[in-house]
Every structure is written in C-alpha cells, then in structure tokens.
Amino acid sequence: MALQLKHITKTFGNGDAQTEVLKNINFSVNQGEFIILSGASGSGKSTLLNILGGLLSPSSGDVLYKGENLFSKEVDKTSLRLNDIGFIFQSSHLVPYLTVREQLMIVAKEAGIKRKEAKDKAQRLLNEIGLSHRLDVYPHLLSGGEKQRVAIMRAFMNEPKIILADEPTASLDADRATSVVQMIKAHVQTKNMIGIMITHDKRLFEYADRVIEIQDGKIEL
C-alpha cells in the first residue's frame, strides 16, 4: 500500500502576488520505506509535508492513499489524521500539565482506546526508549532529548500507517539526533509503516532508504 503524489502544485496568494511553492511534485513511498526530504529553507519541504498530512490542500494534483485521493469529499481527514497519521515536529509540543505517561494516553483516549489498554501500551513504548523511570514526571523536568523521545512515542501510540517528521532532530546534538532517527526508522520497518522525514543534516542521510532533494519547489533529479 503506497502513498502516491501525482502532479502536486501549491500556490499561495492572489492575482499578481501569487507564489508557486510546489511545482509538479511526483513520487511514491511504499510501506516499510523510510525516506528523507531535504533541501534549502523555503524550498517547499514543510508545505509538502503538511499536504501529505492533510493539513493543507494542494492547488492541484492528487495524494493517493489506500487507493483514494486524500482530498476527495468522501475522505474523513480528521479520522485519517487521528488513526492513520503520526506527526513528529521539531519542538516536542508536550502538554505542560500532563506526565510523561499521560502525554501518550491522551492520544489513545482521542482514538477511543480503553484506558487499561492505553496505559499498558504507553508503559511498553516508554520502556522501549528507556524512560520507564520517568512515567510520572512532568515535561519541565525532562531534558531536550527525553522530551523528543516522548514526542516520538506519542506519534506511535495509535500505530499509525504513516509517520511524518518535520526536522525532529534540529535541536539535538549529533548522538541524540542519530538515536532519534534510528528509532523512527526501526518502527517504520518493524511495523511496516510509511516514514517521511525532513532534515538538513546530511549525516542522517545514510539511515534513509531514499533521499529526495527539493529545490525551488521541484524535485531535484
């Protein structure tokens, strides 16, 4: 089950003030594949990721998933974002008044997962990243690396089919950045997900199955 982009364009503005940010983007990503989107700031990477996540509509073109266009009227984009797509951002965006375990459980609650099941699953995921001793700790007591690991596990909580990561390692040192990318890739492969990550860090390219370079809104061949 691939995620396919066909002739995606995105234009902002009106009349003479229009700016074409994405220009005829075409590629597909298969299940179990982890790709990196790279390119200069302002090249259109984040706009493309927002389109893939259903947060922004393309001006033209199709994004096909499960054989359906994500932007057809029949597709429930709210349900899709909740159940099929996991987002990881540059900032962890943890809720300050929730403990580490609660950060994960609130996502499960929104998806209708029973509390006992959610609690057990949160425990397993946090054990996996070495934070079992931090279950009841609040975000202000966590290091930057710990916060980002919690954010990653939060994205995996509902077992999404697609993981979209926008510069998740930008604020981390080299060792922590490598650890985070290895963690994301491992989940993508073992759970047969589709993984797409934006990064400028060329040291991380070796962990991708493919690197897609975007320049001036176009894929650089």
UniProtKB/Swiss-Prot annotation:
For the protein in the UniProt heading, the enzyme class is translocase
| Membrane topology designation | Peripheral membrane protein
Q: Which InterPro entries does this chain map to?
A: AAA+_ATPase, ABC_transporter-like_ATP-bd, ABC_transpr_LolD-like, MacB-like_ATP-bd, P-loop_NTPase
Alphabetical UniProt keywords: ATP-binding, Cell membrane, Membrane, Nucleotide-binding, Translocase, Transport
State whether keyword Membrane applies.
yes
Tell me the CDD domains matching this sequence. ABC_MJ0796_LolCDE_FtsE (cd03255)
Top-rank taxon of the source lineage equals: Bacteria
EC id = 7.6.2.-
Briefly state the protein's biological role: Part of the ABC transporter complex hrt involved in hemin import. Responsible for energy coupling to the transport system.
Give the family per the record.
Belongs to the ABC transporter superfamily. HrtA family.
Q: Quaternary structure per UniProt?
A: The complex is composed of two ATP-binding proteins (HrtA), two transmembrane proteins (HrtB) and a solute-binding protein.
* Protein name, as recorded: Putative hemin import ATP-binding protein HrtA
Q: Which organism is it from?
A: Staphylococcus haemolyticus (strain JCSC1435)
